[in-house]
Amino acid sequence: MIRIEGIQKQYGRGSAAVRVLRDVSLRVETGELVSIMGSSGSGKSTLLNILGILDDYDQGAYYLDDKLIRNLSEREAAHYRNRLIGFVFQSFNLLGFKSAEENVALPLYYQGVSRRARNKLAREYLERVGLGHRAEHLPAELSGGERQRVAVARALITKPKLLLADEPTGALDTATSYQLMDLLREINQQGMTVVVVTHEHDIAEMTSRTIRLKDGRVEAADPERAAQEPGA
């Protein structure tokens, strides 16, 4: 699903240049649930932006679903994002003046789906994340955990092959965080590839494999846990 080979990324030039990613190579197979861990400044946010086709890289190669992602136009990048990737963010990124159902339906609006069809699908996806009864509520009327579930439903409605979750539990309490991770694991068990960026060790432990970044390099890919997995 994801293959990264020798990725390098820096910001700025000359003496002001900051190297953020240094020869990063990794793979994520179809159907995996993987976490990427690292402290502030480790490069994990930059790596996520590259995975999500929100930023380019300077050297190396990134293959997503066997397609080389490199020097794409804005239109091409948007095409692959919309077709292949669903996003979940720490801050939810919901529109406050639209209901939960309308927020979930929004990606389909941009795909030209009719109002009736997209609202029907949005209700189905809210049911899937346990929030069908909250479909008409505004984000301000929902708890943090409910808002994040709405965000997950919105990410899933376009039927992406890859779900990228950037610190999805960062704004949630412990119990709600674990409930959200249970939902992501359930989604993964249904066949979707899920990558979770986190700085929380307990959240990373709920994934099948952890890739650790330090100073822009892959420090480890959790070999001990990998060895415990079936077939390892």
Model-identified regions with their sequence ranges:
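ABC family nucleotide-binding domain
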Residues: I2-L213
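ABC-family P-loop ATPase nucleotide-binding domain
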Residues: M1-Q10, A220-A232
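H-loop (His-switch) and adjacent beta-strand-loop-beta switch element
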Residues: T210-P223
